[in-house]
Amino acid sequence: MNDGKYPTGRAMTVKEGMTRSLNTISAQLLKQLTPQKSYEFMTQQLGFKLVDSRTNEDGTVQSDIDLAPLALGALTDGVTVREMAGGFSTFINDGVYGGTRTYTKVTDSEGNTIMENTPNTDKGFTNVRTDYYMLDCLQNVTAHGTAYGIQLDGVETGGKTGTTTSNTDIWFCGITPKYSGAVWVGYE
């Protein structure tokens, strides 16, 4: 992808753009997919609570259906750490969005199951290649990119870093073969 405006002045893959955390790559990809389709996928398939359209008291209209909110994270109301961890879980679950769960099951002192939290099995990605490619991109970020060093001995890791202007918000969303998680530092 290249329209001549990237900092490198050359074409590059989505994988390299993610590894180097180049926002222009995300924006160009979203432009091709369309903000509307991406918004629908995030809200309908991944359970994100985003703003379709809202008119403020001063008459200004806000919407998350645009490039800056979806490609760069400039969402009207933001997202929760739980939503991000849930979204990233699809990459380690063959494209299936299992919802977010705080626990898997609760047992009593004798091992009897009292409660079980069964995951949702709705499909997130309809194309398994998309899931595989995203997993590969995320693993490359921890192996060679902005999240280099976030590795565990003997465990495959992947993830994505994110920051806002002046580092007022800092994110890391990560995955291992069994778990996904997200960390946010902000409000400063």
Stretch-by-stretch model annotation:
Residues 40, 44, 57-60, 109-112:
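Polar/charged alpha-helical tracts
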Residues 16, 78-188:
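A penicillin-recognizing enzyme superfamily signal
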Residues 50-69, 99-103, 145-152:
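Surface-exposed patches in mature extracellular/periplasmic domains of secreted proteins
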Residues 1-50, 63-93, 139-140:
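Active-site-adjacent helix/loop patches that line small-molecule binding or acyl-intermediate pockets
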